[in-house]
């Protein structure tokens, strides 16, 4: 399980939250995620997918750029998805580990 935190909308089309929210979601395999989005966007190694196949919990509008963490480790950043918490459509996150050399060369960190 990984954690997503943010002040984004609590439901699709809703208002942003006045307090920081957190949701725990499972990582989704690259093949399962690629299958879900096969008619929309290509899932690359620069992406991590997470969410429940049944939907109900996800990042939403206003959460973009927020952290995807587990045990104090940053694994990803909220990137995109099809709506918010829709069944069969996991959230898509930037894969920080895959972009580590780019981050280092552009930030010095």
Predicted features by range, described:
Residues 3-109:
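Extracellular trypsin-like serine protease catalytic domains
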């Amino acid at each position: 399980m990984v954690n997503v935190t943010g002040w984004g909308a609590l439901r699709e089309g809703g208002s942003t939250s006045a307090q920081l929210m957190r949701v725990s979601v499972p990582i989704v395999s690259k093949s399962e995620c690629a299958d879900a989005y096969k008619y929309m966007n290509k899932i690359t190694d620069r992406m991590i997918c997470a969410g429940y196949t049944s939907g109900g919990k996800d990042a939403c509008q206003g959460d973009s750029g927020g952290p995807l963490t587990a045990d104090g480790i940053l694994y990803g950043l909220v990137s995109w998805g099809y709506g918010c918490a829709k069944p069969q459509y996991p959230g898509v996150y930037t894969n920080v580990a895959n972009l580590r050399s780019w981050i280092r060369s552009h930030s010095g960190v």
